[in-house]
Amino acid sequence: MPVHVINEANRCLQCKNPRCRMLGCPIQTNIPEVVRLFKENRMIEAAEILFENNPLSVVCSLVCNHENQCEGHCVRGIKGEPVHFSSIENYISDSCFERLDLSCAPSNGMKVGVVGAGPAGITIAIILARRGYKVTVFETREKIGGILRYGIPEFRLPKSILDRYYRRMRDMGILFRPNFELGGSTGIQDLFDDGYRSVFVGTGAWKPRKLGVPGETFGHVFYAINYLNNPDVYELGDKVAIIGAGNAAMDVARTAIRHGSKDVTVYVRGDKVAASENEYNYAVLDGVHFEFKKNIVRIVDEGAVFCDRVENPETGKLVDDHSTDTLVEADSVMISISQVPRDRLVSKDHDLHLNQRGTLQIDDQGETTMDGVFASGDVVTGAKTVVAAVAAAKQIAENMDAYMQEKFGNKSAE
């Protein structure tokens, strides 16, 4: 057992009103109890609490924005270093994952379709399978994980973790249909026609947002979500300009350096990045450069033209100053300004409606405009964090269970 994990656990004050849990954790992980059990050598019990509360605990321990969540609210952090619960959570959940009892309730005879094997879909599938539903996961790609596999670099989240999830989910009786895209020749109504009682849509947000500037179709311009999917096929060259300042932009920058680019610069519209402090610091350590208060004007063959953003004396807001337009030479220009869902499902199933943001319209129960179809995750909210997807999916699983029990009871779907 790593000594630093034990040391971190010993630093926990076991607060009666834990800020880490109540204010910091989006899914209210019982951090003091987990730490207490860990210190008492009751690892499996600690892991069970983590998994019951967050089926993606292994993943979240690596990719969560801990410095702004649990660790950011730790009382020890007021005057010093917070307890690094991420290290404790990762050690427990990773060490015990294969030993957890994931037995399922007796079958209730009802089939559930889960469209999309990203964070939300995996969470829904695990929760409902354990309650006795026969779950089939439909995934466009060949392997599960969604944004976890195809949007987060290996150095942040090893893909082997997702392979372990796949094996455990198969052991639970969950079925998978890889390379199967709903919204083409097959729609959601076809699932209902085949006896599925409810369908969850968690297809993610894979359509890059455009900048809307001249030159965006040029051959040296790429989108972050596409690049992170398979960086090995890209030849970015030595000098890369990245537009956008979220965690994905940090991932792109650090990946580009690992693939041989020598001069990687992130251009930020404001005076600070949107990425987490940790991800920003890691990018700086890797050699990524940052230019603040810059906005892209247009893309040209030689690179991109940027202007300064200056403060408007009347409003105090930053505005573009085009008198400062400057050409920045770059071999590649990478656009990383978020994503929106694709619309193929909606084009096939006309009962599914989008809201003004271009994401699936749902009610306060997570049900879409199509009866029995629920949705959450990035397909509803746009690109968000993994833990936010898990938190929403947990509630949707409850609502789907309630919907099916009320409408069908224990009637078999056969």
Segments and roles (model prediction):
Residues 199, 303-305, 309, 325-335:
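AMP-binding/adenylate-forming core of the ANL superfamily
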Residues 110-135, 250-257:
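N-terminal Rossmann-like FAD-binding beta1-loop-alpha1 element of flavoenzymes
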Residues 1-111, 159, 196, 201-217, ...:
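Ferredoxin-type iron-sulfur electron-transfer modules and their immediate structural context
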Residues 89-106, 164-184, 207-259, 354-369:
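Glycine-rich dinucleotide-binding loop and its adjacent helix/turn
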Residues 178-190, 293-303, 310:
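A conserved short coil-to-beta-strand element within the FAD-binding core of flavoproteins
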Residues 55, 118-119, 143, 246-248, ...:
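Residue-level detector of alpha-helix initiation sites
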Residues 217-237, 318-322, 328-383:
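FAD-site-proximal beta/loop scaffold in flavoenzymes
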Residues 134-137, 141-172, 176, 253-298, ...:
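Rossmann-like dinucleotide-binding cores of NAD(P)H-dependent redox enzymes
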